[in-house]
Amino acid sequence: MEKPRWASRISKRNILVIINLMKVIIELFGASRDFSDQNSLEFDIENNSSIKDVRNKILDYLDKNFKGNENFIKIVNSSAFCSNDNIISDNYKITNNEKIAIIPPIGGG
């Protein structure tokens, strides 16, 4: 099998690190709409990321943009996530350009 052209340029001294990233779109519903002036958030995440990783990415975003707003943190930690109208677990593996919805708890009276 023939080596790709780029392989001949790599030596022990030159280590090429390729990070495979994919895009995930988080659709915002209910109280999570306060996270942005848009209807969604977009993040670049590593391949093979899970909902748990996305939840942490959202928490990092909130910390950076809203100084760790405690109410927003509670919303993220207690929210469900869904894909294709199905509730998904924190272990669910995300695919590239997948749309995920965050579904905050709903209170009423």
Where are these regions (language model features)?
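Ubiquitin-like/PB1-type beta-grasp interaction modules and other compact soluble beta-rich domains
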Residues: E2-W6, K12-G108
